[in-house]
Amino acid sequence: MDTSTETVTTRNGEWLHISSPRQYILQRQVNLTPQAEAKPALSVTLIPNEFDLIDGNAAVQYMQALAFAEQHNALEQLREFQRKGRREVEAGGEDPSQAEPNIWLETAPSDLPLERVRAYLGYSSFQTRYLDEALKRRGCDFDRNIREAKDPVGYLIPEIQMMRELSRLQSMRFRLAIAEARIQDAIQIFAQQLAMGHHLDEEDFIVSNLVGIACADIGVSDAYYLSETAAAPNLYWAIAALPQPLVSMRRALAYERELAFEQFKQFREVDEIPQPAIYWQRFVAELAEEAKDWSDTGFGELEEFETPAAQAMLIGAAYPGAKFFLTEELGMESDKVEALPVTQVVFLGMRRLYEQLRDDSFKLQYLPSPQRAGFSPYQAEMAAKDKYGWITVLNNLFLPAVQAAGSARDRLQQQLALLQTIEALRDHMAAHDGRLPELLSELRLPAPNDPVTLQPFEYVYEAGQAKLAGAVTNAIKYELVLVPAVEGNSP
Protein backbone atom coordinates (compact mmCIF):
# COMPACT_ATOMS: atom_id res chain seq x y z
CA MET A 1 0.00 0.00 0.00
CA ASP A 2 1.25 3.49 -0.88
CA THR A 3 1.79 5.43 2.34
CA SER A 4 3.52 8.43 0.77
CA THR A 5 0.71 10.77 1.91
CA GLU A 6 0.06 9.12 5.26
CA THR A 7 -0.02 11.26 8.40
CA VAL A 8 1.09 9.65 11.66
CA THR A 9 0.21 11.17 15.04
CA THR A 10 1.89 10.21 18.32
CA ARG A 11 1.92 11.83 21.75
CA ASN A 12 4.87 12.79 23.92
CA GLY A 13 3.52 14.24 27.14
CA GLU A 14 1.59 17.43 26.35
CA TRP A 15 2.85 17.49 22.76
CA LEU A 16 1.28 15.84 19.74
CA HIS A 17 3.80 14.82 17.07
CA ILE A 18 2.08 14.95 13.68
CA SER A 19 4.32 13.55 10.97
CA SER A 20 3.59 13.84 7.25
CA PRO A 21 5.83 13.60 4.17
CA ARG A 22 6.05 17.39 3.90
CA GLN A 23 6.51 18.51 7.50
CA TYR A 24 6.63 17.54 11.16
CA ILE A 25 4.17 19.40 13.38
CA LEU A 26 4.64 19.73 17.13
CA GLN A 27 1.29 20.73 18.61
CA ARG A 28 0.35 21.54 22.20
CA GLN A 29 -2.83 22.76 23.82
CA VAL A 30 -2.22 25.68 26.19
CA ASN A 31 -4.97 26.42 28.70
CA LEU A 32 -4.31 30.13 29.09
CA THR A 33 -4.91 31.96 32.36
CA PRO A 34 -5.40 35.75 32.38
CA GLN A 35 -2.56 37.77 33.88
CA ALA A 36 -1.78 41.46 33.33
CA GLU A 37 1.77 42.61 32.75
CA ALA A 38 3.96 42.83 35.82
CA LYS A 39 4.03 46.08 37.82
CA PRO A 40 6.71 47.44 37.71
CA ALA A 41 7.10 45.96 34.24
CA LEU A 42 10.71 44.81 34.71
CA SER A 43 10.28 43.52 38.26
CA VAL A 44 10.17 39.94 36.93
CA THR A 45 13.41 38.85 35.27
CA LEU A 46 14.82 35.68 33.80
CA ILE A 47 18.48 36.26 32.95
CA PRO A 48 19.65 39.11 35.23
CA ASN A 49 20.30 42.47 33.59
CA GLU A 50 23.80 43.88 33.22
CA PHE A 51 23.59 45.81 36.49
CA ASP A 52 22.73 42.71 38.49
CA LEU A 53 25.12 40.26 36.83
CA ILE A 54 28.27 39.36 38.75
CA ASP A 55 31.68 39.24 37.13
CA GLY A 56 32.65 35.61 37.40
CA ASN A 57 32.81 32.29 35.64
CA ALA A 58 29.61 30.23 35.51
CA ALA A 59 31.61 27.23 34.28
CA VAL A 60 32.92 26.77 37.83
CA GLN A 61 29.38 26.47 39.18
CA TYR A 62 28.30 24.13 36.39
CA MET A 63 31.25 21.83 37.02
CA GLN A 64 30.41 21.79 40.73
CA ALA A 65 26.79 20.94 39.92
CA LEU A 66 27.96 18.07 37.70
CA ALA A 67 30.47 16.73 40.21
CA PHE A 68 29.26 13.95 42.48
CA ALA A 69 32.82 13.72 43.88
CA GLU A 70 31.57 14.25 47.43
CA GLN A 71 28.21 12.62 46.79
CA HIS A 72 29.14 8.97 46.08
CA ASN A 73 26.22 7.51 48.00
CA ALA A 74 23.74 9.89 46.39
CA LEU A 75 25.05 9.06 42.92
CA GLU A 76 24.75 5.33 43.54
CA GLN A 77 21.21 5.73 44.87
CA LEU A 78 20.28 7.81 41.84
CA ARG A 79 21.65 5.16 39.47
CA GLU A 80 19.95 2.35 41.38
CA PHE A 81 16.65 4.23 41.10
CA GLN A 82 17.17 4.39 37.32
CA ARG A 83 18.13 0.71 37.09
CA LYS A 84 15.11 -0.33 39.15
CA GLY A 85 12.80 1.67 36.91
CA ARG A 86 14.20 -0.02 33.80
CA ARG A 87 13.92 -3.48 35.36
CA GLU A 88 10.27 -2.91 36.27
CA VAL A 89 9.15 -1.87 32.78
CA GLU A 90 11.23 -4.55 31.07
CA ALA A 91 9.68 -7.20 33.34
CA GLY A 92 6.29 -6.02 32.16
CA GLY A 93 7.34 -6.08 28.51
CA GLU A 94 7.07 -2.30 28.19
CA ASP A 95 9.27 0.17 26.34
CA PRO A 96 12.29 1.14 28.55
CA SER A 97 11.63 4.79 27.66
CA GLN A 98 8.51 4.53 29.84
CA ALA A 99 10.57 3.80 32.95
CA GLU A 100 10.87 6.15 35.89
CA PRO A 101 12.37 8.70 36.12
CA ASN A 102 12.49 9.41 32.35
CA ILE A 103 8.73 9.11 31.97
CA TRP A 104 8.33 12.11 34.28
CA LEU A 105 9.68 14.31 31.49
CA GLU A 106 6.46 13.49 29.63
CA THR A 107 4.18 13.73 32.67
CA ALA A 108 2.04 16.75 33.49
CA PRO A 109 2.78 18.24 36.93
CA SER A 110 -0.68 17.28 38.18
CA ASP A 111 -0.02 13.61 37.34
CA LEU A 112 3.41 13.23 38.94
CA PRO A 113 3.94 10.67 41.73
CA LEU A 114 5.11 13.45 44.02
CA GLU A 115 6.74 11.39 46.77
CA ARG A 116 8.80 9.39 44.28
CA VAL A 117 9.83 12.50 42.35
CA ARG A 118 10.88 14.22 45.58
CA ALA A 119 12.91 11.18 46.60
CA TYR A 120 14.68 10.94 43.25
CA LEU A 121 15.49 14.64 43.02
CA GLY A 122 16.72 14.56 46.60
CA TYR A 123 19.80 12.61 45.46
CA SER A 124 20.94 15.62 43.41
CA SER A 125 19.55 18.42 45.57
CA PHE A 126 23.07 19.80 46.11
CA GLN A 127 23.02 21.00 42.48
CA THR A 128 20.46 23.73 43.03
CA ARG A 129 22.69 26.12 44.96
CA TYR A 130 25.35 25.98 42.23
CA LEU A 131 22.77 26.61 39.50
CA ASP A 132 21.46 29.59 41.47
CA GLU A 133 24.99 31.01 41.48
CA ALA A 134 25.64 30.21 37.81
CA LEU A 135 22.56 32.20 36.81
CA LYS A 136 24.11 35.34 38.31
CA ARG A 137 27.46 35.05 36.49
CA ARG A 138 28.23 37.21 33.48
CA GLY A 139 30.72 34.88 31.79
CA CYS A 140 31.30 31.18 31.19
CA ASP A 141 34.78 29.93 30.31
CA PHE A 142 35.79 26.28 30.47
CA ASP A 143 39.44 27.32 29.94
CA ARG A 144 39.95 25.04 26.94
CA ASN A 145 42.77 27.00 25.29
CA ILE A 146 41.61 25.24 22.14
CA ARG A 147 43.92 27.22 19.84
CA GLU A 148 46.83 25.30 21.33
CA ALA A 149 45.26 21.85 20.86
CA LYS A 150 47.16 19.54 18.51
CA ASP A 151 44.02 17.57 17.62
CA PRO A 152 41.01 19.89 18.02
CA VAL A 153 38.66 17.48 16.23
CA GLY A 154 39.49 14.84 18.83
CA TYR A 155 38.99 17.24 21.75
CA LEU A 156 36.56 15.66 24.20
CA ILE A 157 33.86 17.72 25.92
CA PRO A 158 31.97 15.20 28.11
CA GLU A 159 30.93 17.91 30.54
CA ILE A 160 28.88 19.57 27.80
CA GLN A 161 26.93 16.40 27.13
CA MET A 162 26.43 16.05 30.89
CA MET A 163 24.80 19.48 30.91
CA ARG A 164 22.05 18.08 28.70
CA GLU A 165 21.31 15.53 31.46
CA LEU A 166 21.46 18.33 34.02
CA SER A 167 18.82 20.15 32.00
CA ARG A 168 16.57 17.09 32.11
CA LEU A 169 16.86 17.04 35.91
CA GLN A 170 15.94 20.71 35.88
CA SER A 171 12.81 19.89 33.89
CA MET A 172 11.78 17.43 36.61
CA ARG A 173 12.46 20.06 39.28
CA PHE A 174 10.35 22.55 37.33
CA ARG A 175 7.39 20.18 37.06
CA LEU A 176 7.60 19.36 40.75
CA ALA A 177 7.65 23.07 41.59
CA ILE A 178 4.51 23.63 39.50
CA ALA A 179 2.79 20.66 41.16
CA GLU A 180 3.64 22.08 44.59
CA ALA A 181 2.57 25.62 43.62
CA ARG A 182 6.12 26.95 44.11
CA ILE A 183 5.79 29.46 41.28
CA GLN A 184 8.91 31.52 42.03
CA ASP A 185 11.00 28.35 42.15
CA ALA A 186 9.60 27.30 38.77
CA ILE A 187 10.47 30.70 37.26
CA GLN A 188 13.98 30.44 38.73
CA ILE A 189 14.47 27.01 37.15
CA PHE A 190 13.20 28.29 33.79
CA ALA A 191 15.68 31.16 34.04
CA GLN A 192 18.50 28.73 34.81
CA GLN A 193 17.66 26.69 31.70
CA LEU A 194 17.86 29.83 29.56
CA ALA A 195 21.11 30.88 31.25
CA MET A 196 22.69 27.51 30.47
CA GLY A 197 21.88 28.05 26.81
CA HIS A 198 23.24 31.59 26.83
CA HIS A 199 26.40 30.60 28.71
CA LEU A 200 27.16 27.78 26.27
CA ASP A 201 27.07 30.38 23.50
CA GLU A 202 30.55 31.33 24.73
CA GLU A 203 31.96 27.95 23.67
CA ASP A 204 34.14 27.43 20.57
CA PHE A 205 32.22 24.40 19.31
CA ILE A 206 28.92 24.36 17.44
CA VAL A 207 28.02 21.15 19.27
CA SER A 208 28.25 23.05 22.58
CA ASN A 209 25.95 25.74 21.17
CA LEU A 210 23.48 23.04 20.11
CA VAL A 211 23.48 21.55 23.61
CA GLY A 212 22.84 25.04 24.96
CA ILE A 213 19.93 25.43 22.55
CA ALA A 214 18.58 22.05 23.69
CA CYS A 215 18.75 23.14 27.36
CA ALA A 216 16.92 26.38 26.64
CA ASP A 217 14.40 24.53 24.47
CA ILE A 218 13.51 22.22 27.37
CA GLY A 219 12.97 25.28 29.53
CA VAL A 220 10.70 27.00 27.00
CA SER A 221 8.62 23.85 26.49
CA ASP A 222 8.12 23.62 30.26
CA ALA A 223 7.28 27.32 30.61
CA TYR A 224 3.83 26.85 29.08
CA TYR A 225 2.84 25.36 32.43
CA LEU A 226 3.47 28.83 33.89
CA SER A 227 1.15 30.38 31.29
CA GLU A 228 -1.49 27.89 32.44
CA THR A 229 -1.08 28.80 36.12
CA ALA A 230 -3.25 31.64 37.39
CA ALA A 231 -0.77 32.60 40.12
CA ALA A 232 2.16 32.89 37.70
CA PRO A 233 3.20 36.46 36.88
CA ASN A 234 3.20 37.67 33.29
CA LEU A 235 6.61 37.05 31.67
CA TYR A 236 6.16 39.26 28.59
CA TRP A 237 8.80 41.84 29.50
CA ALA A 238 11.11 39.26 31.08
CA ILE A 239 11.23 37.46 27.71
CA ALA A 240 11.58 40.73 25.79
CA ALA A 241 14.64 41.60 27.93
CA LEU A 242 16.52 38.38 27.08
CA PRO A 243 19.70 38.60 24.96
CA GLN A 244 18.85 38.61 21.25
CA PRO A 245 19.46 36.00 20.07
CA LEU A 246 19.82 33.92 23.21
CA VAL A 247 22.39 31.71 21.45
CA SER A 248 24.11 33.65 18.66
CA MET A 249 26.67 30.97 17.67
CA ARG A 250 29.02 33.72 16.44
CA ARG A 251 32.06 32.55 18.41
CA ALA A 252 31.62 28.90 17.46
CA LEU A 253 31.01 29.75 13.81
CA ALA A 254 34.21 31.80 13.75
CA TYR A 255 36.20 28.87 15.13
CA GLU A 256 34.51 26.25 12.95
CA ARG A 257 35.36 28.37 9.91
CA GLU A 258 39.05 27.86 10.69
CA LEU A 259 38.80 24.28 11.98
CA ALA A 260 40.31 22.58 8.91
CA PHE A 261 43.43 24.72 9.24
CA GLU A 262 43.54 24.27 12.99
CA GLN A 263 43.49 20.49 12.52
CA PHE A 264 45.88 20.38 9.55
CA LYS A 265 47.98 23.45 10.21
CA GLN A 266 50.27 22.81 7.26
CA PHE A 267 47.46 23.87 4.92
CA ARG A 268 47.98 27.46 6.06
CA GLU A 269 51.34 27.36 4.26
CA VAL A 270 49.82 26.33 0.92
CA ASP A 271 49.86 29.27 -1.49
CA GLU A 272 50.92 30.32 -5.01
CA ILE A 273 54.63 30.69 -4.17
CA PRO A 274 56.53 27.79 -5.83
CA GLN A 275 58.08 25.28 -3.44
CA PRO A 276 60.62 22.55 -4.29
CA ALA A 277 59.63 18.91 -4.69
CA ILE A 278 61.22 17.92 -1.35
CA TYR A 279 58.88 20.36 0.41
CA TRP A 280 55.84 18.64 -1.07
CA GLN A 281 57.15 15.17 -0.33
CA ARG A 282 57.40 16.14 3.32
CA PHE A 283 53.98 17.84 3.21
CA VAL A 284 52.25 14.71 1.88
CA ALA A 285 54.08 12.43 4.32
CA GLU A 286 53.07 14.57 7.31
CA LEU A 287 49.49 14.84 6.12
CA ALA A 288 49.21 11.09 5.57
CA GLU A 289 50.62 10.45 9.05
CA GLU A 290 48.14 12.82 10.67
CA ALA A 291 45.25 11.28 8.74
CA LYS A 292 45.88 7.69 9.88
CA ASP A 293 43.28 7.95 12.62
CA TRP A 294 40.67 9.35 10.29
CA SER A 295 39.52 6.23 8.47
CA ASP A 296 36.02 6.47 9.99
CA THR A 297 35.62 10.20 9.47
CA GLY A 298 35.88 10.63 5.71
CA PHE A 299 39.61 11.22 5.29
CA GLY A 300 40.23 7.58 4.39
CA GLU A 301 40.82 8.71 0.80
CA LEU A 302 44.24 9.87 1.95
CA GLU A 303 44.90 7.29 4.63
CA GLU A 304 44.57 4.38 2.19
CA PHE A 305 47.63 5.52 0.26
CA GLU A 306 50.51 4.43 2.45
CA THR A 307 53.35 4.47 -0.09
CA PRO A 308 54.80 7.42 -2.01
CA ALA A 309 53.86 5.67 -5.26
CA ALA A 310 50.22 5.36 -4.24
CA GLN A 311 50.16 8.97 -3.10
CA ALA A 312 51.62 10.08 -6.43
CA MET A 313 48.90 8.14 -8.25
CA LEU A 314 46.16 9.84 -6.25
CA ILE A 315 47.66 13.30 -6.66
CA GLY A 316 48.18 12.74 -10.38
CA ALA A 317 44.54 11.78 -10.82
CA ALA A 318 43.43 14.89 -8.91
CA TYR A 319 45.62 17.29 -10.91
CA PRO A 320 43.24 17.99 -13.85
CA GLY A 321 40.36 18.97 -11.56
CA ALA A 322 42.60 21.17 -9.44
CA LYS A 323 44.12 22.87 -12.48
CA PHE A 324 40.69 23.48 -14.00
CA PHE A 325 39.43 25.06 -10.78
CA LEU A 326 42.45 27.33 -10.39
CA THR A 327 42.43 28.53 -14.00
CA GLU A 328 38.76 28.54 -14.95
CA GLU A 329 37.14 29.39 -11.61
CA LEU A 330 39.80 31.53 -9.91
CA GLY A 331 41.31 32.99 -13.09
CA MET A 332 44.94 32.05 -12.45
CA GLU A 333 47.10 32.21 -15.56
CA SER A 334 47.50 28.77 -17.08
CA ASP A 335 51.28 29.05 -17.57
CA LYS A 336 51.76 30.00 -13.90
CA VAL A 337 49.72 27.00 -12.77
CA GLU A 338 51.61 24.66 -15.09
CA ALA A 339 54.91 25.97 -13.70
CA LEU A 340 54.00 24.79 -10.20
CA PRO A 341 54.73 21.25 -8.98
CA VAL A 342 51.80 18.89 -9.53
CA THR A 343 51.38 18.33 -5.78
CA GLN A 344 51.29 22.07 -5.14
CA VAL A 345 48.56 22.54 -7.76
CA VAL A 346 46.45 19.81 -6.15
CA PHE A 347 46.70 21.10 -2.58
CA LEU A 348 46.42 24.74 -3.64
CA GLY A 349 43.24 23.85 -5.50
CA MET A 350 42.03 21.93 -2.46
CA ARG A 351 42.62 24.89 -0.15
CA ARG A 352 41.11 27.54 -2.41
CA LEU A 353 38.05 25.42 -3.23
CA TYR A 354 37.51 24.70 0.45
CA GLU A 355 37.78 28.39 1.34
CA GLN A 356 35.32 29.36 -1.37
CA LEU A 357 32.65 26.77 -0.55
CA ARG A 358 33.18 27.24 3.19
CA ASP A 359 32.50 30.96 3.01
CA ASP A 360 29.55 30.44 0.67
CA SER A 361 28.03 28.39 3.48
CA PHE A 362 29.09 30.48 6.48
CA LYS A 363 28.25 33.87 4.97
CA LEU A 364 24.54 33.06 5.03
CA GLN A 365 24.55 33.03 8.84
CA TYR A 366 25.00 36.81 8.75
CA LEU A 367 21.67 37.25 6.93
CA PRO A 368 18.23 37.28 8.54
CA SER A 369 16.52 33.92 8.37
CA PRO A 370 14.08 34.71 5.52
CA GLN A 371 16.90 36.01 3.32
CA ARG A 372 18.80 32.74 3.71
CA ALA A 373 15.93 30.69 2.35
CA GLY A 374 16.82 31.20 -1.33
CA PHE A 375 20.35 29.83 -1.01
CA SER A 376 21.39 26.18 -1.12
CA PRO A 377 25.12 25.80 -0.38
CA TYR A 378 24.71 22.04 0.00
CA GLN A 379 23.83 21.70 -3.68
CA ALA A 380 26.93 23.71 -4.61
CA GLU A 381 29.06 21.39 -2.48
CA MET A 382 27.64 18.30 -4.19
CA ALA A 383 28.13 19.85 -7.63
CA ALA A 384 31.76 20.67 -6.78
CA LYS A 385 32.42 17.09 -5.72
CA ASP A 386 31.12 15.80 -9.04
CA LYS A 387 33.08 18.41 -10.97
CA TYR A 388 36.42 18.50 -9.17
CA GLY A 389 36.69 15.11 -7.50
CA TRP A 390 39.17 14.41 -4.72
CA ILE A 391 40.17 18.02 -4.05
CA THR A 392 36.80 18.48 -2.31
CA VAL A 393 37.94 16.19 0.53
CA LEU A 394 38.36 19.10 2.99
CA ASN A 395 34.83 20.23 2.26
CA ASN A 396 33.47 16.72 2.76
CA LEU A 397 35.12 16.48 6.15
CA PHE A 398 35.13 19.94 7.67
CA LEU A 399 32.07 21.75 6.44
CA PRO A 400 29.61 21.21 9.29
CA ALA A 401 25.86 21.29 8.85
CA VAL A 402 25.93 25.06 9.31
CA GLN A 403 22.47 25.57 7.85
CA ALA A 404 20.93 23.00 10.22
CA ALA A 405 22.69 24.63 13.18
CA GLY A 406 21.38 28.03 12.11
CA SER A 407 17.87 26.58 11.86
CA ALA A 408 18.15 25.29 15.45
CA ARG A 409 19.11 28.79 16.61
CA ASP A 410 16.20 30.33 14.69
CA ARG A 411 13.78 27.73 16.04
CA LEU A 412 14.72 28.60 19.64
CA GLN A 413 14.13 32.29 18.95
CA GLN A 414 10.81 31.38 17.36
CA GLN A 415 9.77 29.44 20.44
CA LEU A 416 10.70 32.35 22.71
CA ALA A 417 8.68 34.70 20.50
CA LEU A 418 5.71 32.31 20.62
CA LEU A 419 5.93 32.25 24.42
CA GLN A 420 6.14 36.05 24.52
CA THR A 421 3.02 36.20 22.33
CA ILE A 422 1.29 33.85 24.77
CA GLU A 423 2.09 36.28 27.58
CA ALA A 424 0.74 39.19 25.52
CA LEU A 425 -2.47 37.19 25.12
CA ARG A 426 -2.64 36.61 28.89
CA ASP A 427 -2.40 40.38 29.38
CA HIS A 428 -5.25 40.91 26.90
CA MET A 429 -7.39 38.29 28.61
CA ALA A 430 -6.90 40.02 31.97
CA ALA A 431 -8.54 43.16 30.56
CA HIS A 432 -11.27 41.40 28.56
CA ASP A 433 -12.96 38.99 30.96
CA GLY A 434 -10.72 36.08 29.99
CA ARG A 435 -11.48 36.32 26.25
CA LEU A 436 -8.91 35.86 23.50
CA PRO A 437 -8.65 38.51 20.75
CA GLU A 438 -9.87 37.79 17.26
CA LEU A 439 -6.67 39.32 15.83
CA LEU A 440 -3.15 39.72 17.22
CA SER A 441 -3.32 43.39 16.23
CA GLU A 442 -5.84 43.88 19.06
CA LEU A 443 -3.19 43.17 21.69
CA ARG A 444 -2.07 46.00 23.95
CA LEU A 445 1.37 44.43 24.33
CA PRO A 446 2.63 43.93 20.76
CA ALA A 447 3.09 40.36 19.58
CA PRO A 448 6.64 39.88 18.27
CA ASN A 449 7.09 38.85 14.65
CA ASP A 450 8.11 35.31 13.82
CA PRO A 451 11.96 35.42 13.79
CA VAL A 452 11.96 32.88 10.96
CA THR A 453 9.97 35.07 8.55
CA LEU A 454 10.10 38.51 10.23
CA GLN A 455 6.34 38.52 9.61
CA PRO A 456 3.45 38.14 12.09
CA PHE A 457 2.76 34.68 13.45
CA GLU A 458 -0.14 32.72 12.03
CA TYR A 459 -3.13 33.28 14.32
CA VAL A 460 -6.61 31.90 13.70
CA TYR A 461 -9.48 32.64 16.10
CA GLU A 462 -12.65 30.58 16.14
CA ALA A 463 -15.42 30.12 18.69
CA GLY A 464 -13.50 31.49 21.66
CA GLN A 465 -10.34 29.49 20.97
CA ALA A 466 -7.36 30.13 18.71
CA LYS A 467 -4.42 28.51 16.99
CA LEU A 468 -1.01 30.21 17.08
CA ALA A 469 1.68 28.81 14.78
CA GLY A 470 5.20 29.56 13.64
CA ALA A 471 6.65 29.14 10.17
CA VAL A 472 8.25 25.85 9.19
CA THR A 473 11.97 25.59 10.01
CA ASN A 474 13.87 22.59 8.70
CA ALA A 475 10.53 20.83 8.07
CA ILE A 476 9.44 21.40 11.72
CA LYS A 477 6.40 23.50 12.61
CA TYR A 478 5.16 24.50 16.07
CA GLU A 479 1.43 24.92 16.64
CA LEU A 480 -0.24 26.04 19.87
CA VAL A 481 -3.95 25.45 20.41
CA LEU A 482 -5.06 28.20 22.80
CA VAL A 483 -7.99 27.56 25.12
CA PRO A 484 -9.04 29.96 27.90
CA ALA A 485 -8.53 28.14 31.18
CA VAL A 486 -11.48 26.97 33.19
CA GLU A 487 -11.46 25.03 36.41
CA GLY A 488 -9.99 21.59 35.76
CA ASN A 489 -8.03 22.23 32.56
CA SER A 490 -4.93 23.91 34.02
CA PRO A 491 -2.11 22.52 36.22
Residue ranges and their predicted role:
Residues 1-491:
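Short acidic linear motifs
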